[in-house]
Amino acid sequence: MSPLMLRLLPLLCIIISAHFVPRPETSPSLVYEIGSTVTFHCRLNTTTNIQSVSWYNKSRLISNHEIQNMDNLSFTDDGYVFIHELNKINNLDVDSKLYFHIKHDRTTSLLKIKARSAYDATCLTCTFTVDNEKTSATSCLKLIMKPIVVLYFRYLNNFLDVTCTVTSYPKPNVVIKFLGEVYKRDIPMVRQNENGSSTVSVSFTFKRRTKLEFVGKTISCLASSWFTNQKASALVTSGEHTVQNHDEYSKEAVKGSNSDETVFTWIVPLILILIISVMVLLISMCIVAFKS
């Protein structure tokens, strides 16, 4: 290497290092239940010359921290400082915080959102601006809802009528297990709920030869949804019975399902009334026209 290159090498290293901005570290994928408070983490291994930290949902700005003067910050003995907090931006409720940890030369940005429905699953990008250069990383959120399983059975004359209803996200696979056999429908009844979850219902009837043939036998409703399995089981009695799995689930998820069911409850009778009214009107018009 020539003497000139040797003399220029330190200068080149300084120039390169001055413009090198490390890439932020973040979890590439997060999995939470619907109704949870989701925390996105974004960390940059430097605390030098940071001008701003921003979070974007696609191209929409949802959080922005601007650092005016790092020299005026006061740090604790362990080099840890909380600098900024935001609670609302662009009419969106967020909980956004920015931390510096000088001892470990690390800057961390936290963004919390409330995942109220399956439609809140998204990808967020955090962007650090350092020395007028931007560096970004993206974290994607996947939402699930553990199956809520309800098993119901009753007798209709000489038949045991069994219904298994499951609400979850993604849409669950549902089967009924009885007397050592597994029963499933190729096309079950499916209802889409307000929060994005699905309610799947499967029904079967079993003929009994004697009145007490099925009493004391175990019947189960099995549900699977995205690596999650749930079930509700009961011993068949001589009368009507309902059983539900006892796992905790989000209130938001239940609210979404119930609200959708309420809408369904009043819409169907209203449609029937309208149809009957139209038919009565048409019949009346026909009678008048015939008489005239």
From Swiss-Prot:
Residues 24-136 form the Ig-like V-type domain. The keyword Transmembrane helix applies. Disulfide bonds join 42-126. It is found in: Host membrane. It is a single-pass membrane protein. Glycans are attached at residues 45, 57, 72, 195. The keyword Transmembrane helix applies. The lineage of its organism: Viruses, Duplodnaviria, Heunggongvirae, Peploviricota, Herviviricetes. Residues 1-18 form the signal peptide. This is Putative OX-2 membrane glycoprotein homolog. GO terms for molecular function: cell-cell adhesion mediator activity. Keywords: Disulfide bond, Glycoprotein, Host membrane, Immunoglobulin domain, Membrane, Signal, Transmembrane, Transmembrane helix. GO terms for cellular component: host cell membrane; membrane. Its main location: host cell.
